[in-house]
Amino acid sequence: QPLFQRFQDNGCILADDCSLTLLVDIKSSAEATYAVLARQLVQYADMLSVTKDDQFQQRSVTVIVSGNRPLESIASSNPRYACVDGRLEDLNQSKTSLLYPLISDNWRLHFRYRGQGEMPQAERDKLREVVGQAKTQGKRLRFWATPESPDLWQELLDAGVDLIGTDQLTRLHDWLRSQPKR
């Protein structure tokens, strides 16, 4: 409701007219929860990015469903007011960025580097390869369960990872503000 009120008052959410990404992390039953979510999203359709008949229209808020994702229910919705948070294995399949605009995965399942000292070159190369795959497919990339480390944040930033996840928001904010403009 607060986002919708801001949208109604200003005609947008963010000042630069970019789309805000709203990640909805489903922890309970995927199908039952999505059924409720889908009904709620329709009420805010004016501000939500939408895919209809395979045509995407970006609006003020783009909803991405994460966690327990009801893949077929989301994919078959038309119009569709939510997208799917993909996994790294989705990069090796022909899954469109219209349905999978974001790829998220558990850092610890794919990398041994824990943010202390220098990242091994083989892992740095692997990270850059994954980033390249995502960008080539028009998808954004993020990892969860990352170490809370400026050394790792620097590696993610240098590699071009789109979103850096953290539980230490102030610390990451201050660190990002200290970085040179890119």
Residue ranges and their predicted role:
Residues 1-182:
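Catalytic cores of phosphodiester-bond hydrolases, prominently lipid phosphodiesterases
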